[in-house]
Amino acid sequence: MADILIVVDMQNDFIDGALGTKEAVAIVPYVKGLIENFPGKVLFTRDTHLENYMDTQEGKNLPVKHCIRGTEGWQIRQELDALRKTEAIDKVTFGASNLVKVLEAEERIDSITFCGLCTDICVISNVMLTKAFFPEIPLIVDAAGCAGVTPQSHENALQAMKVCQVKVINE
């Protein structure tokens, strides 16, 4: 069986930094357990911006500097990063376009499970990107291992993914 877990953007700035929430802090132990007990390969994405972030389209719409390469906020949460066995997939947009190449290199994939932050931005973006390129692979979102910008937007994102034939578990 070739199952993959994708841990999306579990970075300090999204947990308790510039864009942190109490919901994000609360899922860290759950995500740690998920990683420790996952029977397959675990991949991590990492939101990565440069000093010119505020000049980018995203920066103009979300004018909060975050996940600037090399900063403490950019780092994957220490207790999760300690479990990482592969290079993090750095991404400069909500969806990791380079994730497709990483997944294409896998010999066999039976399912892909997602967890992480933020449900309503980067999790849903990466789930839908993966769904577009790998429509026959079952995709799963572990809702207990996700948090959104707000609880309502988290729920909205979960519902949107369900409509797109993504299995949502542990709501």
Task: Give the positions of each predicted feature.
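Short catalytic/ligand-binding loop motif for oxyanion handling, primarily in non-cytosolic enzymes
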Residues: 51-54, 122-123, 149
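Active-site acidic carboxylates
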Residues: 1-88, 140, 155-162, 167-170
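Histidine-anchored nucleotide/phosphate-binding helix
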Residues: 31-37, 124-134
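A short glycine-rich beta-strand->turn/loop micro-motif centered on a GG-aromatic cluster
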Residues: 113-117, 136-151, 171
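Active-site beta-loop-alpha junctions enriched in small/polar residues
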Residues: 47, 94, 144-146
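Short, charged, surface-exposed secondary-structure boundary motifs
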Residues: 98-100, 149-153
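Active-site glycine- and acidic-residue-rich loops that bind
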Residues: 22-25, 120, 148-150
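Internal catalytic-core helix/loop-beta-alpha segment
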Residues: 70-121
